């Protein structure tokens, strides 16, 4: 994980991860911010850019990666979506909750993801033009989607 690369305790920073800066409680003076959300995001962005520049092969989920890697060669930007029924069933199974709670949980997480992405990026969260490929995982199921994306990436990298 990003935290372990920099020897940072995950328990301390987890509450600031993928959250937009709280403007009321933070200040920026001479380019330095006291916002843990902003500082953590910038640290993550810099680490990801450095790993890509070093030629490392890795997968990033979220974290504004569509914009972080903009213009870099050999980067495949993928947006995976699913229909509501498939997402609700998956959340219910994974988190052992009823459908109503699953929908509320998804809405809350998506709202936070959107706020984080849109705070740090020029593109809007979920804008398909920011990605190389968008796929609905409910069409092929998860295993089928993985197989499809694996083949796509292999062909992309072999070009």
Predicted segment positions?
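ATP-dependent small-molecule kinase phosphotransfer cores
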Residues: 2-57
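Small-molecule kinase domains that catalyze NTP-dependent phosphoryl transfer to phosphate-bearing small molecules
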Residues: 18-26, 38, 67, 98-143
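Arginine/glycine-rich "motif VI" loop of SF2 helicases in the C-terminal RecA-like domain
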Residues: 95-98, 158
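Glycine-rich phosphate-binding loops of nucleotide-dependent enzymes
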Residues: 155
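Short, amphipathic alpha-helical "lid/cap" segments that border enzyme active or binding sites
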Residues: 41, 45, 142-150
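Short, solvent-exposed amphipathic alpha-helical segments in soluble enzyme
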Residues: 94-96, 150-152
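ATP-dependent NMP and nucleoside kinases share a basic, alpha-helical "lid"
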Residues: 49-52, 58-95
